[in-house]
């Protein structure tokens, strides 16, 4: 099963999918979907259309220059079949894909690390620019501690006599009120 690549977006085209366009000079263009075909008919440049692989490679968002890509090049040289070379080829393909995955993941991590550094620099600049808006949580700490100490000292200095609290049963109080006791009598009751 041969897997073709789209002329416009460079994605894979599996058998039975996509459209072929043949120009008058017998040049064959294969497209994975109508979106790519329409963009080609509108004479769009794949390197300037943001969602294509060509754009991502041109903009440095994906790994573009690497020796592992040399293995994917098509070679139109017929070779005599032998089982050994076939097995070696399969092993080599597995090894190449492993290496390519490692390199692309490393490339992505480096890109993310650069973005993080830029973000930190922007944050530092923003803080320096707007320093007046930021107030440290410890800015008024000394004043608060001094104020609390003064309040505690004031409470300690005040030696007010403690009020004597007497508890009265609520039911008894209600009965007395119903019976018509006066206010003076209630005060005497509390004392």
Swiss-Prot record:
Keywords tagged on the record: Nucleus, Phosphoprotein, Ribosome biogenesis
Main location per the UniProt record: nucleus
High-level lineage: Eukaryota, Metazoa, Ecdysozoa, Arthropoda, Hexapoda
GO biological process: cytoplasmic translation; ribosomal large subunit biogenesis
Localization in the cell: Nucleus, Nucleolus
Provenance organism: Drosophila melanogaster
Gene: RpL24-like
Function as written in the Swiss-Prot or TrEMBL entry: Involved in the biogenesis of the 60S ribosomal subunit. Ensures the docking of NOG1 to pre-60S particles.
Assigned protein family: Belongs to the eukaryotic ribosomal protein eL24 family.
Protein name: Probable ribosome biogenesis protein RLP24
CDD domains noted in UniProt: Ribosomal_L24e_L24 (cd00472)
């Amino acid at each position: 099963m041969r897997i073709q690549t789209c002329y416009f977006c460079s994605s894979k085209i599996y058998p039975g999918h996509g459209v072929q366009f043949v120009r008058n000079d017998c040049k064959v263009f294969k497209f994975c979907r109508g979106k790519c075909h329409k963009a080609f008919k509108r004479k769009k440049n794949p390197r300037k259309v943001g969602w294509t692989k060509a754009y991502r490679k041109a903009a440095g968002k994906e790994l573009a220059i690497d020796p592992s890509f040399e293995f994917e090049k098509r070679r139109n040289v017929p070779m005599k079949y032998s089982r050994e070379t076939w097995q070696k080829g399969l092993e080599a393909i597995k090894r190449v894909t492993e290496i390519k995955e490692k390199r692309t993941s490393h490339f992505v991590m480096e890109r993310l690390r650069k973005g993080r550094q830029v973000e930190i620099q922007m944050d530092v600049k923003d803080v320096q620019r707007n320093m007046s808006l930021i107030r440290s949580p410890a800015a008024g700490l000394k004043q608060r501690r001094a104020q609390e100490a003064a309040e505690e000292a004031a409470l300690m200095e005040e030696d007010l006599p403690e009020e004597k609290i007497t508890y009265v049963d609520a039911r008894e109080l209600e009965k007395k009120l119903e019976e018509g006791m006066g206010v003076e009598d209630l005060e005497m009751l509390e004392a």
